[in-house]
Amino acid sequence: QTYTFWEHMYKLSAHKTHEEANFLMETRWVLYMEDADTLHLFRVAPRAWFADGERIDLEGVRSYFGRIDARVRSHVGEGYIEATVTCDPERKPSLLAVRLPHPQGKKPVRVTGGRYDETTEWVLIDDFNGEASIRLEY
């Protein structure tokens, strides 16, 4: 099995299109995933993506809840990680769950913008209104 993509279109392919589609869906699920009335962001994103100076930008991605914009900025060298999330207020999820892990596994001393679950590293926002600003301080 090879999990690679052709650079050009051919009439025949040794690659299976469902495998290629699954690769794209799995990449999407790293960044965002819907589960009933919950939107999960960065559910399995690697800790290295949250190293000092790193950033994650999702602009206009499509979901069951409509268009999503999400932005993460890591300033762990200065002691914090920030995230903002917006989505269509008419189609918003009931619960927004944003995972913002510290690259070295530290737990925040202060969280604004939601309630923090130390076990899962989720910031949970109940009754999400379509906009969120989150800050974790270490």
Regions found by a protein language model. Give the residues of each.
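Non-catalytic C-terminal accessory modules of carbohydrate-active enzymes
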Residues: 1-138
